[in-house]
Design a protein with these regions (language model features):
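Sequence/structural signature of beta-propeller domains
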Residues: 1-169
């Protein structure tokens, strides 16, 4: 779920908290688990939209789609898919990016994260970066604990940083 907190303009100690995006039930009350928004993780807020990035690597067993970025319209409260994490080439996907194991066919195993508006930095309106967490892109030990951070267990997964343009703000 993603919540929206609207503060009272006259008294910031008062406000209304509501569910803005719910992946468990639709507005009509129907069960939508795995078909709508899954495990919202990161958000990027612009003047008119909230971009909600799913954390699909939670291996949601009911997932029916790969990780998505949803565009939530602040004015209307509606949301739609903005970007899909479709991997493309099935042969490459299963030989390089998902070399073995039970997770290779699961939906949402890669995710988007860290969406940032860089328009003001580079002087090009509507330009954003997005990080792709490619959790099954293993490639031997090439990506073994790349940050060298102390971790409960070592990990290895590749990633990419994308620059996208013409993003509505």
């Amino acid at each position: 779920r993603m919540y929206q907190l609207k503060l009272d303009a006259n008294d910031p100690l008062k406000g209304v908290l509501k569910i803005a995006a719910d992946g468990d039930v639709s507005a009509s009350g129907a069960n939508t688990k795995g078909t709508d928004i899954i495990n919202p993780d990161n958000i990027c807020v612009t003047q008119n939209y909230v971009y909600i990035q799913e954390d699909g690597d939670s291996f949601w067993p009911e997932a029916t789609h790969n990780s998505l970025i949803w565009q939530y319209n602040i004015a209307t409260g509606s949301k739609k898919v903005f970007m899909d994490m479709t991997h493309g080439d099935a042969n490459m996907l299963n030989s390089i990016y998902n070399p073995a194991g039970a997770n290779q066919l699961k939906k949402g195993i890669w995710e988007h994260g860290a969406m940032e508006d860089i328009s003001d930095v580079i002087g090009v309106p509507g330009t954003f970066t997005i990080n792709v967490h490619a959790h099954t892109w293993i490639d031997g030990d090439k990506f073994l604990n790349p940050s060298k951070a102390t971790s409960v267990q070592s990990y290895k997964s590749g990633g990419q940083t994308l620059i996208i343009t013409n993003v509505p703000r």
